[in-house]
Curated annotation (Swiss-Prot):
UniProt source species: Macaca fascicularis (Crab-eating macaque)
Family per similarity comment: Belongs to the FAM229 family.
Superkingdom as given in the UniProt entry: Eukaryota
Listed PANTHER family: PROTEIN FAM229A (PTHR35355), PROTEIN FAM229B (PTHR35355:SF2)
Pfam families for this protein: UPF0731
Positions of region (Disordered): 1-44
Protein's name in the database: Protein FAM229B
Length: 80
């Protein structure tokens, strides 16, 4: 069966700049934005340009750990 736009259920709340196409049946964009539909454990926010989703309330140590360069081996640190 070919993929049709709007057949996949949304996994995040609709926010400003989102299209109403593909919403789950019975869910309006205003209902999704009112906060009651949002998960209390993880909230998603859009950047000002509505280009990306951001997970709020994530400790900075998570981002710091994700951005660390891979550990160098002892041979690379002390070449002969």
């Amino acid at each position: 069966m070919p993929f049709r736009f709007g057949t996949q259920p949304r996994r995040f709340p609709v926010e400003g700049g989102d299209s109403s196409i593909g919403l789950e049946p019975g869910l309006s964009s205003s209902a999704a934005c009112n906060g009651k539909e949002m998960s209390p454990t993880r909230q998603l926010r859009r950047c000002p340009g509505s280009h990306c989703l951001t997970i709020t309330d994530v400790p900075i140590t998570v981002y710091a750990t994700m951005r660390k360069p891979p550990a160098q081996s002892s041979k690379e640190m002390h070449p002969k």
